[in-house]
């Protein structure tokens, strides 16, 4: 990770896109760190910390000792910016009453955050049934802003589709 120009460029363009849709979005300070293989992205106080040790590639030998193959495939350079956006947006738009929500509502909340990350990235990185449900909903309801989508924690309107 001696050169992170590609990551910086994608972070900048992604946050520029987000600012178009969410003008009040605070732009975080971003730093890189070496962790203890226990966290990939650390978010707090308008900062994002990228633990580079969690993005050393799917062939990094130490990962095989501690992680499942499904986890290892996400531990690549290509996942850094999507993960930064995902965890940062989750910190700003948490799900209220998480414990009392159904699994479907929880999945839709994550799908909503991932859908917005895809918009910010400018390409479809996150793909799931729930991201598709949000995409269908937003295509049918073009008057709903991305900011309002993120602020709304009522998923009954999507579940009924």
Model-assigned labels for residue ranges:
Residues 2-144, 151, 157-160:
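Acidic/His-rich structured neighborhood in mature extracellular/periplasmic domains
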